[in-house]
């Protein structure tokens, strides 16, 4: 028994969960390097496509994280993305200004987030019902106002980051992308720091986990929730803008 306890103590300092993640990462890296050695151009193309197709999923997930951490269940992310994609597309058709189209998409997501927050916080509507309302509303609006035969003025282009884009394998994947892809990568890092290493993040998590306790120590629960849902809406709007400004470059009903 004593020897067993000593052995357990000997290895107790090792974070086995981290070890498993590192081993899995090394295995994946080994597979990638193997295929890269055989067909480097094809491997880079596949990894680049994988990253770009993941962008709306990343941004949608971040939207959900910001809402959930504040105690709001947001199942209206798809509706926020849909309406943002539509208005970004129409702005691009009417003006040809890609930056304005991107801002319109983000603003649309923010407004839809504010609407969800109003339903859930002010009116105390069931959050699942509120998200369903947004999804149905977005589907109805885009289906009614959509017109066929419209053409956009182009898509967002790749921005290579100098010498970094020439690094074998990872250069074309990470450092030669359109702007929204870069923004999505940076937002993942920024969100991690914001939620777990700032006072605002601590308050957000407190509001989501125990709102009464947070209110007792003077945290404005409603304000935190409003801001988080709006910020999440901006990210959903960015995801929608990606679909029509950087991804497929067009819009279809639904």
Q: What label would you give each PLM region?
A:
Residues 38-49, 147, 195, 232-254:
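Inter-helical junctions in multi-pass inner-membrane proteins, predominant
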Residues 50, 54-61, 82, 105, ...:
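Small-residue faces within membrane-embedded alpha-helices
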Residues 2-59, 87, 99-100:
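Membrane-interfacial amphipathic/re-entrant helices at transmembrane-helix boundaries
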Residues 20-34, 60, 139-143, 183-192, ...:
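Hydrophobic core segments of alpha-helical transmembrane domains in multi-pass membrane transport
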Residues 138-197, 226-227, 247-254:
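Transmembrane helix-bundle core of multi-pass membrane transporters
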Residues 45-95, 102, 111-128:
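Single transmembrane alpha-helix segments in multi-pass membrane proteins
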Residues 10-15, 69-73, 112-167, 197-199:
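Short loop segments and helix-boundary regions at transmembrane helix junctions
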């Amino acid at each position: 028994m004593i020897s067993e306890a000593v052995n357990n103590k000997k290895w107790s300092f090792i974070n086995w969960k981290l070890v498993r993640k590192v081993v899995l990462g090394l295995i994946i890296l080994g597979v990638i390097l193997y295929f890269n050695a055989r067909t480097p151009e094809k491997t880079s193309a596949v990894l680049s496509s994988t990253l770009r197709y993941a962008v709306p999923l990343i941004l949608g997930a971040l939207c959900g994280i910001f809402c959930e951490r504040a105690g709001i269940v947001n199942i209206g992310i798809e509706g926020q993305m849909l309406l943002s994609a539509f208005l970004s597309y129409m702005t691009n058709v009417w003006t040809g200004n890609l930056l304005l189209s991107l801002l319109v998409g983000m603003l649309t997501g923010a407004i839809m987030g504010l609407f969800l927050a109003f339903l859930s916080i002010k009116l105390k509507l069931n959050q699942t019902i509120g998200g369903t309302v947004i999804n149905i509303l977005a589907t109805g609006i885009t289906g009614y106002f959509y017109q066929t035969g419209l053409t956009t003025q182009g898509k967002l282009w790749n921005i290579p980051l100098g010498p970094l884009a020439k690094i074998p394998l990872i250069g074309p994947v990470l450092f030669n992308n359109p702007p929204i892809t870069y923004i999505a990568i940076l937002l993942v890092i920024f969100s991690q720091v914001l939620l777990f290493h700032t006072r605002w993040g601590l308050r957000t998590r407190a509001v989501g986990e125990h709102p009464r306790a947070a209110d007792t120590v003077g945290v404005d629960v409603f304000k935190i929730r409003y801001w988080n849902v709006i910020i999440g809406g901006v990210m959903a709007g960015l995801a929608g803008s990606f679909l029509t400004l950087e991804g497929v470059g067009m819009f279809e009903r639904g």
